[in-house]
């Protein structure tokens, strides 16, 4: 009987250990992908152009003209985080400012079609950051939105200082949508007036019209 119990205890320990090791592996796989950050820029440029052809050309031209700029701040847990920002197409008549937040495994480049929509169609200033462990931002793992909200809350006054608007919208996609929704539950400046979330499957050519309608409805509701 003692022998049976001994083997049962050993078997149970092995199962528990295997479960712990598997859990750690899956956690690292999800939160610490090997290819990330700067090493992943080229892939995301292709993804941006697959979502809307010509996106990176538009981005590169504005950057070459000095219209689109980069900036960094010290974010959550003292990691440096990066963002790009661009003024409205007609800056003197800008309608507000949008912060566009990307999803899991992406960076500021992927959803350029949203940046372009806000800037060129809605005449909004836009700031679009890299979340931690993405793009040009530092970080030791993906934050899955919950802690990313602290960085977004730091970007909000930065964008306000740059553009000096009295109306701001936060628009997130996938994990970025989760980030935006969790940010919306915190105490924010009164000029943050609108929150838009988009599913990861929403793409131009299929559901971009609904994205535009959702955003424009939100923007028209400003008071």
Language model features with spans:
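An N-terminal hydrophobic leader/cap segment in hydrolases
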Residues: 20-74
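Short beta-strand element of the alpha/beta-hydrolase
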Residues: 94-103
